[in-house]
């Protein structure tokens, strides 16, 4: 590989490290993450579920987070209720075809969400219509609404009970911060609910 290509990888890793270091000392992000963990813990303790939505890379993050909650993060324990609304291709394509892509998540929230559940909506831009519509529908149905976004997505906060803002406007870095923070939230949820089981 040429030096120029090698430097692209090195530069990305350096930017990634710097972004993670900023996130690790970002008081607002850390406080928001703690409140989000507390909200999800409360919902799961009450027999409710976590619904998660996102597009593209954020859809992959939604599935990853749901897998950590339903399967396990680190500890052997009972399964907890989490559903990524990004995985049912029949529902996604039927809703997209009949109602438009902007409603692929809102329609699922309407059918699957109940008061006391939590919707985690991930959008690096904070402007995705399908995500914003899901948040609106969740509010109508009495769900707790949580958003993950970047510094350009603050408008999304109007629809969220809690908004976690990655300190970046670079999509790949935002996604990396989201997933790393989500892992910390999953670890917190698991530890708290495991204490309940003892």
From Swiss-Prot:
<dbReference type="GO" id="GO:0008968">
    <property type="term" value="F:D-sedoheptulose 7-phosphate isomerase activity"/>
</dbReference>
<comment type="similarity">
    <text>Belongs to the SIS family. GmhA subfamily.</text>
</comment>
<feature type="binding site">
    <location>
        <position position="183"/>
    </location>
    <ligand>
        <name>Zn(2+)</name>
    </ligand>
</feature>
<dbReference type="GO" id="GO:0008270">
    <property type="term" value="F:zinc ion binding"/>
</dbReference>
<keyword id="KW-0479">Metal-binding</keyword>
<protein>
    <recommendedName>
        <fullName>Phosphoheptose isomerase</fullName>
        <ecNumber>5.3.1.28</ecNumber>
    </recommendedName>
</protein>
<dbReference type="GO" id="GO:0005975">
    <property type="term" value="P:carbohydrate metabolic process"/>
</dbReference>
<feature type="binding site">
    <location>
        <position position="128"/>
    </location>
    <ligand>
        <name>substrate</name>
    </ligand>
</feature>
<feature type="binding site">
    <location>
        <position position="175"/>
    </location>
    <ligand>
        <name>substrate</name>
    </ligand>
</feature>
<dbReference type="InterPro" id="IPR004515">
    <property type="entry name" value="Phosphoheptose_Isoase"/>
</dbReference>
<dbReference type="GO" id="GO:0005737">
    <property type="term" value="C:cytoplasm"/>
</dbReference>
<keyword id="KW-0862">Zinc</keyword>
<dbReference type="GO" id="GO:2001061">
    <property type="term" value="P:D-glycero-D-manno-heptose 7-phosphate biosynthetic process"/>
</dbReference>
<feature type="binding site">
    <location>
        <position position="68"/>
    </location>
    <ligand>
        <name>substrate</name>
    </ligand>
</feature>
<feature type="binding site">
    <location>
        <begin position="123"/>
        <end position="125"/>
    </location>
    <ligand>
        <name>substrate</name>
    </ligand>
</feature>
<keyword id="KW-0963">Cytoplasm</keyword>
<dbReference type="GO" id="GO:0097367">
    <property type="term" value="F:carbohydrate derivative binding"/>
</dbReference>
<feature type="binding site">
    <location>
        <begin position="97"/>
        <end position="98"/>
    </location>
    <ligand>
        <name>substrate</name>
    </ligand>
</feature>
<dbReference type="InterPro" id="IPR035461">
    <property type="entry name" value="GmhA/DiaA"/>
</dbReference>
<dbReference type="InterPro" id="IPR001347">
    <property type="entry name" value="SIS_dom"/>
</dbReference>
<comment type="subunit">
    <text>Homotetramer.</text>
</comment>
<keyword id="KW-0413">Isomerase</keyword>
<dbReference type="InterPro" id="IPR046348">
    <property type="entry name" value="SIS_dom_sf"/>
</dbReference>
<dbReference type="Pfam" id="PF13580">
    <property type="entry name" value="SIS_2"/>
</dbReference>
<feature type="binding site">
    <location>
        <begin position="55"/>
        <end position="57"/>
    </location>
    <ligand>
        <name>substrate</name>
    </ligand>
</feature>
<feature type="binding site">
    <location>
        <position position="175"/>
    </location>
    <ligand>
        <name>Zn(2+)</name>
    </ligand>
</feature>
<comment type="function">
    <text>Catalyzes the isomerization of sedoheptulose 7-phosphate in D-glycero-D-manno-heptose 7-phosphate.</text>
</comment>
<keyword id="KW-0119">Carbohydrate metabolism</keyword>
<comment type="pathway">
    <text>Carbohydrate biosynthesis; D-glycero-D-manno-heptose 7-phosphate biosynthesis; D-glycero-alpha-D-manno-heptose 7-phosphate and D-glycero-beta-D-manno-heptose 7-phosphate from sedoheptulose 7-phosphate: step 1/1.</text>
</comment>
<feature type="domain" description="SIS">
    <location>
        <begin position="40"/>
        <end position="198"/>
    </location>
</feature>
<feature type="binding site">
    <location>
        <position position="64"/>
    </location>
    <ligand>
        <name>Zn(2+)</name>
    </ligand>
</feature>
<feature type="binding site">
    <location>
        <position position="68"/>
    </location>
    <ligand>
        <name>Zn(2+)</name>
    </ligand>
</feature>
<dbReference type="InterPro" id="IPR050099">
    <property type="entry name" value="SIS_GmhA/DiaA_subfam"/>
</dbReference>
